[in-house]
């Protein structure tokens, strides 16, 4: 027999918030038990309602702020307490960045007491209208006769009913009502689980994931919507390989973005991985290359290179750049971008960097500089090879401070010093910590 969930108290309870959890919730301790409370900041006195009561901890949501923290601000989005896309809109952006710096510092200290010789100034940009890619759920609710379009609600799998999204670029974030009207008017509305939007510097693409073939009427409705806005229109009847554009039928098949500091332009397919914060990306790439201190006679290795976000700009500074990425499609995109920018001093290789690389020709060469931009799991296997690859300077771009700290400890043990580190606010209003670190080979005495 399934255990019945304990009935939750209806009356709000008081709580004193002591600190913040890793996912942005306030932490209170009541009668020896920890309670995680949404929409609450350290130092605040709040009234909250329980959302879950468990044996070891409870969860709740603040319904009244009795004593507010000086760090509290009015959220820029009306849906901030419902939508799970953001977790820190009620905290000032400056304090958000300070908190991310503290998380990076704590993680480095936790793994072997690491401390960089220099803390880099945080890289910051716009805190609204910054996100250029999004995947949104679509749900037709027959009982209510309505269609939902949005992100998941906080702490559950329901789709939040949104009108706007203030972190998406305005051309997308202020059209969610229009997208919902479009989806609701389709004959196939119950067979469309999600839509995806991606923007380049000048164009927006809308991708419709559909489980059944679309009728001619539905296709015409989608075409009319996209043509009216000048958006590219894509359909996805199956897995990612089935994505295809139905409008415009002629012309450029890619979106693109520019790196003005390098004078280059990178093309991408809407489903390709790209950094979602264009402004921070435009600052991050030249920062990383400046920290690498590349000379025209240098050979540079770019690991986890993707479509060439760092590789292509680096080729404008270096004698030769080698990029390695697991996806053959991304390798082809890298070469496409090299041709697009009339660069011939590059080569790309497809290989899973979590696997043995000893049989790879590129791994038997030596390099002057190495850039690493791994996934959340880090790059421990590649880090162990750094002495053999020979670079005197390494720049490591990380989306997970815990694996950065782990890999930093390994690099220190292999004879590198942690020259500098800092955070980049790639995802304002979230707890996600993007960071960058510089390692230099220690000179033998």
UniProtKB/Swiss-Prot annotation:
EC numbers on record: 2.1.1.190
Q: Does the keyword DNA repair apply?
A: no
The processes (GO biological process) annotated in the record are: rRNA base methylation
- InterPro entries the record matches: 23S_rRNA_MeTrfase_RlmD (IPR001566), MeTrfase_TrmA_AS (IPR030390), MeTrfase_TrmA_CS (IPR030391), NA-bd_OB-fold (IPR012340), SAM-dependent_MTases_sf (IPR029063), TRAM_dom (IPR002792), U5_MeTrfase_fam (IPR010280)
- Enumerate the PANTHER family for this protein: 23S RRNA (URACIL(1939)-C(5))-METHYLTRANSFERASE RLMD, RNA M5U METHYLTRANSFERASE
Q: Does the keyword Iron apply?
A: yes
Ranges for the region named Disordered are 1-21
The record's gene field reads rlmD
Q: Which residues bind [4Fe-4S] cluster?
A: 77, 83, 86, 165
Which residues make up the binding site for S-adenosyl-L-methionine? Answer: 275, 304, 309, 325, 352, 373
Q: What is the uppermost EC class here?
A: transferase
Q: What is this protein called?
A: 23S rRNA (uracil(1939)-C(5))-methyltransferase RlmD
Q: Which family does it belong to?
A: Belongs to the class I-like SAM-binding methyltransferase superfamily. RNA M5U methyltransferase family. RlmD subfamily.
What region holds the TRAM domain?
5-64
Against Pfam families, the record matches this protein to:
TRAM (PF01938), tRNA_U5-meth_tr (PF05958)
Per its record, what are the GO molecular function terms?
4 iron, 4 sulfur cluster binding; iron ion binding; RNA binding; rRNA (uridine-C5-)-methyltransferase activity
Catalysed reaction, written as an equation:
uridine(1939) in 23S rRNA + S-adenosyl-L-methionine = 5-methyluridine(1939) in 23S rRNA + S-adenosyl-L-homocysteine + H(+)
Q: What does this protein do?
A: Catalyzes the formation of 5-methyl-uridine at position 1939 (m5U1939) in 23S rRNA.
Q: Where is the active site?
A: 399
> What keywords tag this UniProt record?
4Fe-4S, Iron, Iron-sulfur, Metal-binding, Methyltransferase, rRNA processing, S-adenosyl-L-methionine, Transferase
């Amino acid at each position: 027999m399934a255990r019945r969930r304990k009935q939750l108290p209806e009356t709000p309870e008081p709580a004193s918030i002591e600190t913040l959890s890793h996912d942005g919730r306030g932490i209170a301790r009541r009668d020896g038990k920890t309670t995680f409370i949404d929409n609450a900041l350290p130092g605040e006195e709040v009234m909250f309602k329980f959302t879950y009561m468990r044996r070891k901890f409870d969860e709740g949501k603040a319904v009244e702020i009795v004593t507010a923290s000086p760090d509290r601000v009015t959220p820029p989005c009306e849906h901030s307490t419902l939508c799970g896309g953001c977790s820190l809109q009620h905290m000032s952006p400056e304090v958000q960045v300070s908190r991310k710096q503290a998380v990076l510092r704590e993680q480095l200290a936790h793994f072997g007491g690491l401390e960089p010789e220099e803390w880099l100034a945080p890289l910051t940009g716009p805190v609204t209208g910054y996100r250029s890619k999004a995947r949104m759920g679509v749900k037709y609710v027959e009982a209510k006769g309505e269609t939902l379009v949005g992100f998941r609600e906080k702490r559950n799998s329901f789709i939040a009913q949104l009108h706007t999204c203030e972190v998406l670029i305005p051309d997308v974030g202020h059209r969610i009502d229009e997208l919902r009207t479009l989806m609701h008017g389709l004959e196939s509305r119950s067979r469309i689980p999600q839509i995806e939007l991606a923007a380049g510097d000048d164009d927006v693409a809308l991708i419709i994931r559909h489980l059944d073939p679309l009728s001619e009427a539905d296709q015409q409705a989608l075409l009319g919507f996209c043509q009216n806005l000048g958006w590219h229109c894509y359909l996805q009847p199956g897995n990612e390989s089935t994505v295809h554009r139905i409008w415009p039928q002629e012309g450029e098949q890619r979106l693109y973005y520019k790196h003005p500091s390098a004078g280059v332009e990178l093309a991408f397919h809407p489903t390709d991985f790209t950094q979602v914060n264009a402004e921070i990306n435009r600052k991050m790439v030249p920062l990383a290359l400046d920290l690498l201190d590349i000379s025209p006679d240098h050979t540079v290795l770019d690991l986890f290179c993707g479509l060439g976000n760092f590789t292509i700009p680096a080729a404008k500074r270096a004698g030769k750049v080698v990029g390695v990425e697991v996806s053959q499609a991304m390798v082809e995109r890298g070469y496409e971008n090299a041709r697009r920018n009339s660069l011939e001093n590059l080569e790309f290789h497809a290989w899973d960097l979590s696997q043995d690389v000893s049989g790879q020709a590129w791994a038997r060469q030596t390099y002057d500089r190495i850039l690493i931009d791994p996934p959340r799991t880090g790059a421990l296997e590649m880090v162990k090879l750094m002495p053999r690859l020979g670079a005197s300077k390494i720049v490591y771009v990380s989306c997970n401070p815990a694996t950065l700290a782990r890999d930093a400890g390994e690099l220190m043990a292999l004879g590198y010093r942690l020259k500098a580190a800092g955070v980049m606010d790639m995802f304002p209003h979230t707890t996600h910590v993007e960071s960058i670190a510089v390692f230099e080979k220690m000179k033998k005495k």
